[in-house]
Amino acid sequence: MTRDQAREKVIFALDTGEFAHVQYWAETLSDKVGMYKIGKQLFTACGPAAVRMIQKFGGEVFLDLKFHDIPNTVAMASVEAARMGVKLFNLHALGGYEMMAKTVEALDKEFKGGDRAKVLAVTILTSSTEETLKDLGIEHTVPDMVVRLATLARKAGIDGVVASPREIPLIREACGSDFLIVTPGVRPSFAALNDQKRVMTPAEAVKAGSDYLVIGRPIGDAPDPAAAAELILGEIVAG
């Protein structure tokens, strides 16, 4: 794998509420990462302006708002997300088949079957454990729930899933090679685990079959973020 191919796989998590930070990261990491993840904190603080700032510097956006509501509400919110020109956005698979299928239907109608943002379904959050599921009344194991939700998402026409690296082989087997897998819970060899439980290194996740890697603090908290990002690219290329 080349460095450019590795770069395209890296999504930097913009874990900030400050608009000024958006431009800083867009400039600092423009040749180090392929995409920027805008989550709830940043989007609540800055709104679509954060998306436009990334796009101004030629960056792609993964809008990580994890929609979960009644089907029509999620479908209409999804259309608005796609209209912003983001590359990826997501919703919760736990919202159910109808919510996901209606979203795909609304997007295909809006974009007439042409190019549009890819929709990802969140399976089980990487901070969740078996105990977390039991607290919610779910008796299945984490891997079983991930596969169940990924399969349901695929059936509804969703483009891929957000899932822990540990579940990549199971998802690939259940959903096929053309189903996108975006993996948080990726920690390079030089970084701490923080609050994510089911993790892999970038090289391990890519080897397992991940299409995109979401990485935040190992880059953002590093003394030299650009150098940290370059180290990660090196890990991926080296395999």
Curated annotation (Swiss-Prot):
Record bears the keyword Signal: no
SMART domains, per database record: OMPdecase
SUPFAM superfamilies noted in UniProt: Ribulose-phoshate binding barrel
UniProt GO molecular function: orotidine-5'-phosphate decarboxylase activity
EC annotation from Swiss-Prot or TrEMBL: 4.1.1.23
Catalyzed chemical reaction(s): orotidine 5'-phosphate + H(+) = UMP + CO2
One BP annotation, GO: 'de novo' UMP biosynthetic process
The keyword Cytoplasm is annotated on this UniProt entry: no
Active site: K66 (proton donor)
EC supergroup of this enzyme: lyase
Segments forming a coiled coil: none
Annotated positions binding substrate: 15, 37, 64-73, 126, 187, 196, 216-217
Keywords: Decarboxylase, Lyase, Pyrimidine biosynthesis
Pfam families tied to this protein: OMPdecase (PF00215)
Domain of life: Bacteria
Pathway the protein contributes to: Pyrimidine metabolism; UMP biosynthesis via de novo pathway; UMP from orotate: step 2/2
GO cellular component: cytosol
Self-association state and partner proteins as the record states: Homodimer.
Protein family per UniProt: Belongs to the OMP decarboxylase family. Type 1 subfamily.
PANTHER family: OROTIDINE 5'-PHOSPHATE DECARBOXYLASE
Function: Catalyzes the decarboxylation of orotidine 5'-monophosphate (OMP) to uridine 5'-monophosphate (UMP).
Protein name in UniProt: Orotidine 5'-phosphate decarboxylase
